[in-house]
Design a protein with these regions (language model features):
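Terminal amphipathic helices with adjacent charged low-complexity linkers/tails
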Residues: 88-95, 102, 172-203, 434, ...
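Internal maturation/activation junctions in enzymes
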Residues: 294, 336, 596-619, 645-727, ...
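Catalytic alpha/beta core of large soluble enzyme barrels
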Residues: 221-233, 237-246, 538-542, 604, ...
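Core nucleic-acid recognition elements
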Residues: 2-8, 18, 44-270, 286-292
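Short, surface-exposed, low-complexity cationic segments
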Residues: 23-41, 115-129, 270-277, 738-743
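Function-dense linear segments that define catalytic or interfacial modules
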Residues: 254, 260, 269-284, 288, ...
Length: 846
């Protein structure tokens, strides 16, 4: 634009009555667009002449209005013979006028003038005809009834946008989120009126009300909180889908005791960041910003307990816990008590029952006295129902039993609908620990005998616990027990067990599968222990040991009699989880991924020291191993965005490369953290230190070899690093697909509290449509093979589901289990039959 020296200083009155400085550049740009739209070229000199004429004619107009300016542009274009351009400009004005009318009508009907700006932004950002606000207006007016309050009308408007969401118009879920966010912010402003002020004032108020942990303001100065407030990016609220924002406002942000949300989404992310960076030394506010950015950009999600409880008075941040149940009355009830305390604070549980004696075993030499594991599991079931996670939902627990345990047949019928109801436990999730020998026989000689024995009898007669061994050593001792006539055996065939497993899996989705030899073979900390089982969602694989009673003594203190019970803490596993949202990350950008992984690893490491532990046993184990579990979500989202089909070799090659780099970045970041903050206590002798970790995984390239040497010198901060959780809830928050699962459908309606909510595959469009194949339509062999490629790079395990249809035969399902075992996959989570609905675990949703 030329003629800058001829700028006219005056004001223009906008349509809302507001007077603002006149900007002649806007006239120039509008005319330029009109010419460009008609494919007409115009020289800068002629454009300046037209503009000068318009400005000269406007200079005598008082007051100057938007309509007067546009009328003058039309007249000048016509006078200079640009009829087609003038016509296009007139049509453009008419279109803009229609857009304004529909905005004003909706805002007036709701009774909220501030809504107009939100609707204007929606029109700017969603320009396709399918997202016309006229359609929203029609749907909205069909919901309006006489006597509705302003809040009810605003809710009806949001509902209208939700119901316009279809497979062909998926972005309505983003429009609905903006409308929901506007309604929320209006209510939130009213709630804080006269209370808060700046962020520090709001945090002080929440702290005084007992809703915010006082440790935040104790660790940060007023100036630091003010600096943190400057980090807030409210525009990132526009990343939410309706489902994600609705879930976040209902379950994650801080609420008053009357369930009114008091925290904005961005304040929630910032509060979590403030908590996780609390103990950082140098550049603490820099880490607050990095943590906030990764969360608010939805590139990383922390586990549900961390998202919900960080910054709160009871900050239980861990997702799952795993306990080894001892074979004693005191030990079993201690484990039940541990589960109750974990459940009270919202944690899920994995419990290993492989050491508990079988039904009919001896107690203090009395034959047939033991009731077996089923009776104890029923108590676990009742505890899960009774201790209902702060009144939100009942407890969740997976119970694990070895494939050679004498109570296995009854265990495999815990959740089935037939049989004696006194032997059922419908609210627990059974899982079986399989040795290699079992799968080898299932593959090579399924009619071979399989002998079920009691662990207590083996320990009494042989002097060792069979479950304490794995691999060839386990197999040697198993055969030794089989050949010992003193040990009572319940002999069946491998086929009998396989049939029970598959029947239960197809009917109930369980038992989960834990391939114990694959797990222990790749355990980087096998030098200090044994992994008996996994957690509730089958992604955790860490050393375990039962809590042991040492003594009970009576003392006198200050004249009072005190009973002191001493226990050896064992290894009570804790899962601290987060997930990389692969669908929202540039996974090909190695530098960006390394920075993101580094930030996530640091945040998880901080969880260990900042956590509120429901049990001292958990705290001791967590501080000894400092185990974390960085996983992923948005896996199918990632593939579809890149035009990669699930059932393709390209998928396998891509996932191999992506997960190798994630692992490389994680190990590199963890070694650097060890140099800065110190290594975990049991590093010496680990596979990390000896280099066996890298050798077992075939990491022979130069960069891996350099990293292996660095690790040997600097150590590792955390004993375990990677674990892929299901992310059923937090993937909704971040608008991506769950975990490593394929999507269920491109589009479906979910019934929720009497209304139907649309669920749309992430970024569904004509570009991604053909790459989103539904889970039950996918050849599951591809899923298993992909899991095998990923497993090489994951030191723990994956929540990997199998999706089957009614057409699957038992032999086909068995073949999938065998393929998983051969591929080195450590665990199999649910078998999701198309006719079966199974509950998602919310504890591990990272």
């Amino acid at each position: 634009m030329t003629g800058e020296d001829e700028r006219i200083e005056m004001e223009i009155r906008k349509r809302n009555g507001e007077s603002v400085p006149f900007q002649q550049e806007k006239i120039f740009n509008a005319m330029k667009k009109a010419f460009d739209g008609q494919g007409k070229e115009i020289g800068s000199r002629e454009m300046d002449e037209i503009l000068a004429t318009v400005l000269n004619n406007l200079s005598v107009t008082v007051p100057l209005t938007v309509e007067r300016v546009q009328d003058e542009v039309e007249r000048t274009l016509m006078e200079r013979g640009h009829y087609e351009v003038a016509k296009a400009y007139i049509l453009y004005r008419e279109k803009r006028s229609a857009l304004r009318r529909v905005r004003h009508t909706i805002a007036r009907t709701v009774g909220d003038d501030s809504l107009d700006e939100v609707l204007r932004r929606i029109q700017m950002d969603f320009t396709e005809e399918v997202y016309s606000l006229a359609a929203l207006q029609m749907k909205f007016e069909s919901f309006c009834r006489p006597g509705m309050t302003e809040d009810e009308r605003a809710e009806a408007l949001t509902k209208a946008a939700v119901e316009l969401t279809t497979a062909e118009a998926p972005k309505w879920e983003f429009i609905a989120a903006r409308l929901l966010n506007h309604s929320f912010r209006c209510r939130n402003a009213q709630e804080w009126e006269g209370r808060g002020g700046d962020l520090y004032g709001r945090l002080r108020y929440l702290t005084d009300k007992g809703l915010y942990g006082d440790y935040i303001l104790a660790h940060y100065t007023h100036e630091e909180i003010a600096m943190a407030e400057d980090f807030l990016c409210p525009e990132r609220d526009e990343l939410f889908t309706y489902s994600g924002l609705d879930l976040l406002l209902k379950r994650y942000v801080i609420q008053s005791r009357s369930r009114v949300p008091l925290e904005t989404p961005q304040e929630m992310f910032l509060g979590i960041a403030l908590h996780l960076a609390m103990n950082e030394g140098s550049d603490r506010m820099g880490w607050v910003k990095r943590f906030y950015d990764m969360l608010s950009r939805m590139e990383v999600t922390m586990a549900t307990p961390t998202m919900s409880n960080a910054r709160k008075p009871y900050h239980q941040l861990s997702s799952c816990f795993v306990d080894t149940v001892p074979d004693s009355l005191d030990g079993i009830y201690r484990s039940l008590d541990n589960f109750a305390k974990v459940s009270k604070f919202g944690g899920g549980m994995g419990m290993y029952f492989g050491k508990v004696r079988a039904a009919g075993s001896t107690i203090r030499g009395f034959q047939g006295a033991a009731g077996g594991v089923i009776r104890w599991i029923r108590l676990v079931n009742d505890t899960a129902v009774a201790v209902d996670q702060l009144g939100m939902r009942q407890g969740a627990v997976a119970v694990y039993l070895d494939a050679w345990h004498r109570d296995l047949p009854e265990f495999l019928q815990l959740r089935t609908n037939n049989g004696d109801d006194r032997m059922k436990a419908h609210d627990v999730f059974p899982a079986v620990c399989y040795p290699d020998l079992f799968w080898r026989l299932a593959e090579e000689n399924i009619d071979a005998p399989w002998h079920l024995m009691c662990p207590h009898e083996i320990l009494t007669i042989k002097g060792y616990a069979l479950e304490d061994y794995w691999g060839t050593e386990w197999e040697k001792r198993y055969l030794d027990c089989v050949n010992d006539p003193r040990i009572e055996k319940r002999s069946v065939t491998v086929k009998d067990i396989v049939r029970l497993v598959l029947r239960s899996a197809v009917e109930t989705g369980t038992p989960f599968a834990f391939n114990r030899d694959s797990v222990n073979r790749m355990n980087p900390n096998g030098h200090t222990g044994m992994i008996y089982c996994s957690n509730l969602c089958t992604e955790i694989a860490q050393n375990m040991a039962p809590i042991e009673h040492i003594s009970t003594e009576v003392h006198t203190e200050n004249g009072d009699t005190v009973v002191v019970t001493a226990t050896r803490p064992g290894e009570f596993v804790v899962c601290n989880l987060a997930s990389l949202s692969l669908g929202n990350l540039p996974v090909e950008d190695e530098a960006y991924m390394e920075r993101t992984v580094e930030t996530a690893i640091r945040a998880l490491d901080n969880v260990i020291d900042l956590n509120f532990y429901p049990l001292e046993y958990a705290r001791l184990t967590n501080q000894k191993y400092r185990s974390i579990g960085l996983g992923v979500s948005g896996y199918h989202h990632m593939l579809a965005k890149r035009g990669i089909r699930w059932e393709s070799e390209e998928h396998l090659a891509f996932t191999d490369a992506v997960f190798e780099h994630i692992n490389y970045a994680a190990v590199k970041a963890d070694a650097a953290l060890a140099r800065e903050k110190g290594r975990y206590a049991l590093f010496e002798g680990s596979d990390w230190q000896t280099g066996a970790y890298f050798e077992k995984r075939g990491y022979t390239s130069e960069k891996w070899q350099v990293l292996a040497k660095t690790v040997a010198v600097q150590g590792m901060r955390n004993a375990y690093l990677l674990a892929v959780a299901p992310t059923s809830s937090t993937s909704i928050l971040s608008g991506t697909s769950a975990g490593i699962d394929p999507i269920m459908k491109k589009f479906f309606l979910e019934e929720k509290k009497g209304s139907m909510l649309p669920r749309v595959a992430p970024e569904l469009s004509m570009d991604t449509w053909w790459y989103y194949k539904a889970a039950h339509l996918i050849d599951q062999s591809w899923s298993v093979r992909a899991a095998g490629f990923r497993q090489r790079h994951i030191d723990q395990a994956q929540s990997m589901n199998l999706y089957i249809t009614n057409d699957y035969s038992m032999r086909q399902v068995l073949r999938l289990y065998l393929e998983a075992w051969r591929a080195g996959v450590k665990t199999v989570y649910y078998v999701r039959s198309k006719a079966l609905e199974v509950e998602d675990c919310e504890s591990c949703s990272s």
